[in-house]
Amino acid sequence: MKLKEQKKFGILWLSIGAALFLFCRYTLSVYTYLIEDGNFVVLRTLGKKISPICSVSLKTGIAIVKMPHTAAEKEEYRKKCGNVRSRFNYCRTLSPENAYAFVLDFNGRKTELLFEPNEEFLHSFEMVFANVRREYLRELYGDDGESGDA
């Protein structure tokens, strides 16, 4: 084999190895979502290693929204959430059908945390978030939060 062919063959094998590594690294990760002490926490499990990779206060939250798929849904999403500056994807699959976004204000930037909850977690998250949001607005405005833009 000529030297050029050997280099091409080596690059091909290196590319295949890198692709396999990235595929295993990101698609074999399992995400666990928790509500803990008023925070939304995301844990990533890769093999036997469990790492906390995200923890944000529910007080910074703006909305929990199902991710849009159609053009009409995308327009409605833009109306509700506005211009999102940052996005962090904590979904278990590459193209999730039932992904949700926890939209929050992070250091003055509107940010999305994408996650793929089961129905039970989603229901609990929505209830806890609504309570935390209501209490936070009471702290800010000293009433039931009706005077703020929720």
Predicted regions and their residues:
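Alpha-helical transmembrane spans
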Residues: 1-29, 149-150
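Phosphoinositide-binding peripheral membrane targeting modules
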Residues: 42-82
